[in-house]
Curated annotation (Swiss-Prot):
UniProt topology in membrane: Multi-pass membrane protein
Reactions catalysed: a ubiquinone + NADH + 5 H(+)(in) = a ubiquinol + NAD(+) + 4 H(+)(out)
Keyword field: Electron transport, Membrane, Mitochondrion, Mitochondrion inner membrane, NAD, Respiratory chain, Translocase, Transmembrane, Transmembrane helix, Transport, Ubiquinone
Top-level taxon: Eukaryota
Protein name per the record: NADH-ubiquinone oxidoreductase chain 1
Membrane-spanning parts: 3-23, 68-88, 100-120, 136-156, 172-192, 223-243, 253-273, 294-314
Keyword GTP-binding among UniProt keywords: no
Protein family per UniProt: Belongs to the complex I subunit 1 family.
Length: 318
């Protein structure tokens, strides 16, 4: 029974990731006035499965001078963390109902740094190492703003439990009152998932392919799956935090469809950003966080702390 539950949890995520890669190629294709994948299956719908078969049947090569254990463990850790992040998310029901669900998600996203660092260091390649160091600095930096934004949202929510956010947003979504936080959160999730215009870790013109340059076949596919699973997970968290994950109805299937549609629209925005914007310079990336986002998020956090205290003398209105 446990194995069946595990499969029912993992397979839909992997299927969503598979079709997200297809949607991305189709969207980018049409934005660049071309068709995208259209050969394998009707309208190219079987392309993700063809890619999966190709990647997982190839021989996984590794550099002769690489550190074998870390080289093998890095992609496994990346995919494991990407799949574990989904456990406390209410969609509208959770797999693991945690009191500190948001802290759990924040700590897991911090752990994903290790898989990138291990892969870059264990490859024994200067390009992979530079890509890994960039990724670590970028991820750790943007986690600061993510943590402060989460703290601000939790001050409004009054709890670290994700399920209570749907109750908080019964009358109106938090994005209406906290839109500056939502905007900074969304840009920070782009940086956290190493997506364009913050894809400095995979700068093809500079670093060949970034931290995974020495990976091929199955291990490379695992990194790929982890990246796209993280993208969908981050957009799901954005939906829960700012867009009210469930409606006021007691119909779970309608709540789930609403949640899925919001997450899909946010994910499509990720692809639109990739097609529209060029890559940032590294110094611009760091300036955006430390000189713009950090002061703003701290100021807003102090505002949300002081507002309830300042208004505590006013009697509640009926």
């Amino acid at each position: 029974m446990f194995t069946l539950n595990l499969l029912l949890y993992i397979i839909p995520i992997l299927l969503a990731v598979a079709f997200l890669t297809l949607i991305e190629r189709k969207v980018l294709g049409y934005m660049q006035f071309r068709k995208g994948p259209n050969i394998v299956g009707p309208y190219g719908l079987l392309q993700p499965f063809a890619d999966a078969v190709k990647l997982f049947t190839k021989e996984p090569l590794r550099p002769l001078t690489s550190s074998i254990l870390m080289f093998i463990l890095a992609p496994i850790l990346a995919l494991s963390i990407a799949l574990t992040i989904w456990t406390p998310l209410p969609m509208p029901n959770t797999l693991l109902d945690l009191n500190l669900g948001l802290l759990f998600i924040l700590s897991l996203s911090g752990l994903s740094v290790y898989s990138i660092l291990w892969s870059g260091w264990a490859s024994n390649s200067k390009y992979a190492l530079i890509g890994a160091l960039r990724a670590v600095a970028q991820t750790i930096s943007y986690e600061v703003s993510l943590a402060i934004i989460l703290l601000s949202v939790m001050l409004i929510n009054g709890s670290f439990t994700l399920k209570t956010l749907s109750t908080t947003q019964e009358n109106w979504w938090l994005i209406t009152t906290t839109w500056p936080l939502a905007m900074m959160w969304y840009i920070s999730t782009l940086a956290e998932t190493n997506r364009a215009p913050f894809d400095l870790t995979e700068g093809e013109s500079e670093l060949v392919s970034g931290f995974n340059v020495e990976y091929a076949a199955g291990p490379f596919a695992m990194f790929f799956l982890a990246e796209y699973a993280n993208i969908i997970a981050m957009n799901a968290i954005t939906t829960i935090l700012f867009l009210g994950s469930s409606l006021t109805t007691n119909l779970n299937h309608i709540d789930t469809i609403s949640f899925m549609l919001k997450t899909l629209l946010l994910t499509m925005a990720f692809l639109w950003v990739r097609a529209s914007y060029p890559r940032f310079r590294y110094d611009q990336l760091m300036h955006l966080l430390w000189k713009n986002f950090l002061p703003l998020t701290l100021a807003l956090c102090l505002w949300y702390i002081s507002l309830p205290i300042a208004l505590s003398c006013i009697p509640p209105q009926m």
